[in-house]
Amino acid sequence: MDIKRFGNRQGKTIMLLHGNLMCWRQFENLIPLLEKKFCVYAVSFDSFDGTAETTYTTAQAQADKLAEYIEKELDGRLDLLYAESLGCGPTIFLKASPNIQIGRMILSGPEYLDFGVLNRLILKVMPQKQYRTAHEKYMPAWALRFMGQTEQGMQTMLRRI
C-alpha cells in the first residue's frame, strides 16, 4: 500500500481511495484543486501500488492497513473519506472501526463502466440482483472473488450497513 500526502498540513484531512485497476493517480487532476485548502491523502491499495511486491487480498485487510496509518499519522480522525468503486469496501470497514472517526464519507459507484450495447440489458437485470443481495444478505462466490472479499467479510459488511 502506498499513501501520498499533498497540500496544506493545517487544513482539514481528505483521503481518496481509488477504484479497480487504478492507483492514486486516478485523482491527479483533482488533487491540485484541493491541496491549497486541504491536507490530501491519496491511497494506492496493495497490488495497485506499483511495487509488484504486494497483493490485494480482502477489503478488510486494506481497511486494517488504512486504520493503522490513520491512527498513527492522523490521531484516528479523517474529516472526509472519498471512495471510488473498489475503495468502497475498505471504507465501510473503516467506518465500522471503533478507533477511526470519519466526519463525512462519499461512496461513488462504478460510474465509468460502459457496457455499450449491453447497457439496457444490464440496467434491467442488475437492480433486481442488487436488491436481492441486500435483502438476502448473500453474495455468489464468483462475485466475492471478483471483489477480493470473503464470505465472512461480506456478512460483516452487510450487517453493518
Give, region by region, the residue ranges found by the protein language model.
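Conserved alpha/beta-hydrolase catalytic His-Asp/Glu region
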Residues: V117, Y131-I161
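Active-site signature of alpha/beta-hydrolase-fold catalytic machinery across serine-
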Residues: N29, F93-S97
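Flexible "cap/lid" loop of the alpha/beta hydrolase fold
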Residues: A96, I102-T133
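Structural signature of beta-strand start/N-cap positions in the alpha/beta core
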Residues: T13, C39, L78-L80, I102-R104
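Active-site loop/oxyanion-hole signature of alpha/beta-hydrolase fold enzymes
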Residues: Y41-L80
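Conserved HGGG/HGGXW glycine-rich cap/lid loop of the alpha/beta-hydrolase fold
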Residues: F6-A52
